Regions:
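ATP-binding/phosphotransfer module of carbohydrate and carboxylate kinases, centering on a glycine-rich
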Residues: 1-62, 105-113, 156-312
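Short, basic and Ser/Thr-rich N-terminal targeting/leader segments
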Residues: 9-11, 65-67, 117-119
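Short glycine-rich anion-binding loops that position phosphate/pyrophosphate groups of nucleotides
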Residues: 11, 74-77, 119-122
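Short beta-strand-loop/turn "lid" adjacent to the catalytic site in phosphate-handling enzymes
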Residues: 34-37, 53-95, 106-107
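Glycine/charged-rich beta-loop-alpha catalytic/anionic-binding loops adjacent to active sites
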Residues: 86-94, 131-139, 269-278
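Conserved phosphate-binding catalytic cores of ATP/NTP-utilizing and phosphoryl-transfer enzymes
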Residues: 90-115, 131
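Short gly/pro/ser/thr-enriched loop/turn and capping motifs at secondary-structure boundaries
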Residues: 101-103, 122-123, 287
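Glycine-rich phosphate-binding loop of actin/hexokinase-like ATP-binding domains
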Residues: 110-162, 166
Length: 312
């Protein structure tokens, strides 16, 4: 019996195949597949799912036929299930959103909250009765506070203000120009509006903000602390929807933004100010969470093992 878990995100698609004991037999990576609508979206989605699953099957040495599969997607599952059924040979199928599989990966099948800060951001939780709630995750136009994209957007804003003479001096200005080859912050702002700088490429500049903060730039430090504060706020919002005051709650963090010690420790401090809350890193990745959901679909209470250590 074979089981499939897929994490289809804004940056990459990761597939894991496991046997009935929970042992991971193969993994595969392909391009992003978060949007089906729009020019070429359907074709990219199909290519990403097929590519990641075929790569995982090749590594495992198995045919692509599954007892159960769970796939979680950024951008929601509503327009994707029919396509998945066309692509996969599977008996039992769950198509859900990426926050749901991230939560299962982060805290297992227990109650808790996962707060994700990668290209975008969201907080998502589940109580002991299975009730779920979310906060944030509104996308880059209306939300994604504390995400990598948002941090870079804020960094460009302070760089523009400094350049135009209505903001304080900041090393973020020179950092952004050095990293992108732009001559001015104004030029970079216009480049960010072009197809040369998709959101993922803009978000990829976020670690440079952390490096600038490490060199003592006050505005860079403030941006990171503010981002951590916003992530703590959406976490508190989910807690308030699901848990009573003082009730023990496990909060897990996930995503590249938490690679910053400043963000991570400020977030932990703010979350643990709430009575009963403990914060720490996610136990497993969203792809492992998807695999765990696939096991549950088939009525198996097994834990994944032999999980690849290097996963996007």
């Amino acid at each position: 019996m074979l089981f499939l878990g897929v994490d289809g995100g804004q940056t990459a698609t990761l597939a894991l195949i496991a046997g009935e004991t929970g042992r991971v037999l193969g993994s595969g990576v392909a391009g992003p597949c978060n949007h089906v609508q729009g020019a070429g979206g359907r074709e990219k989605f199909i290519a990403a799912i097929r590519g990641s699953v075929e790569a995982a099957c090749a590594q495992a040495g198995v045919a692509p036929a599954f007892v159960a599969a769970c796939l979680g997607f950024s951008g929601g599952p509503e327009d994707k299930e029919a396509l998945v059924r066309e692509i996969l040979s599977v008996e039992k199928l769950l198509v859900t959103d990426d926050a749901a599989i991230a939560l299962t990966g982060a805290v297992g099948r227990q109650p808790g909250i996962v707060t994700i800060a990668g290209t975008g951001s969201i907080s998502y939780g589940r109580d002991a009765l299975g009730k779920r709630a979310r906060a944030g995750g509104w996308g880059y136009l209306f939300g994604d506070e504390g995400s990598a994209f948002d941090l870079v957007r804020q960094a460009l804003r302070v760089a523009l203000r400094f350049e135009e003479g209505w903001g304080p001096r900041t090393a973020l200005h020179a950092m952004l120009l050095e990293q992108t080859g732009a001559r001015t912050a104004n030029e970079l702002m216009h480049r960010f509006y072009t197809s040369d700088f998709p959101r993922s490429r803009i978000a990829a500049l976020a670690p440079c903000i952390n490096e600038t903060a490490a060199r003592g730039d006050v505005l860079a430090i403030e941006l990171l602390h503010a981002g951590a504060g916003q992530l703590a706020m959406i976490t508190a919002a989910v807690r308030g929807q699901l848990f009573a005051a003082g009730e023990p709650v496990r909060v897990a963090w996930m995503g590249g933004v938490f690679g910053s010690v400043r963000v991570r420790e400020r977030f932990r401090t703010l979350v643990e100010l709430e009575d009963g809350c403990t914060a720490g890193p996610a136990a497993h990745s969203p792809a492992v969470g998807a695999l765990m959901e696939a096991f549950q679909l088939a009525g198996l209470a097994v834990e994944p093992s032999n999980v690849p250590s290097a996963m996007p």
